[in-house]
Curated annotation (Swiss-Prot):
GO terms for molecular function: acylphosphatase activity. Signal peptide: none annotated. Keywords: Hydrolase. This is Acylphosphatase. The gene is acyP. It comes from Gloeobacter violaceus (strain ATCC 29082 / PCC 7421). It comes from the Bacteria. Its EC number is 3.6.1.7. Residues 6-92 form the Acylphosphatase-like domain. It is an enzyme of class 3 (hydrolase). Gene3D superfamilies: 3.30.70.100.
């Protein structure tokens, strides 16, 4: 079994008001990835993904496009030590 990884992700562009957080939660649940997602005051979306490396990478790749109404212009990823998250949630902005 692969060791879990943790990716801290920031997505910029037209990513708020386009169902990005809810769609990210759905994509994470399909991949079996834990973590969270939230809107930032500066217009970006911030997320943390924890899970098997391949599943986390698929979710990062999904974020490069996001849901149909999104226009992703920037994606920043920082890898961190996993914290053992067990579910995925949308945090209040």
């Amino acid at each position: 079994m692969a060791t879990a990884v943790r990716a801290h992700v920031w997505v910029g562009g037209k990513v708020q008001g386009v169902y990005f957080r809810a769609a990210t939660r759905e994509a994470a649940q399909r991949q079996g990835v834990a973590g969270w997602v939230r809107n930032l005051p500066d217009g970006r979306v911030e997320a943390v993904f924890e899970g098997p490396p391949a599943a986390v990478q698929r979710l990062i790749d999904w974020c490069r496009q996001g849901p149909p109404a999104a226009v992703v212009e920037q994606l920043r990823v920082a890898y961190e030590l996993p914290e053992g998250l067990t579910h995925f949630e949308v945090l209040r902005s």
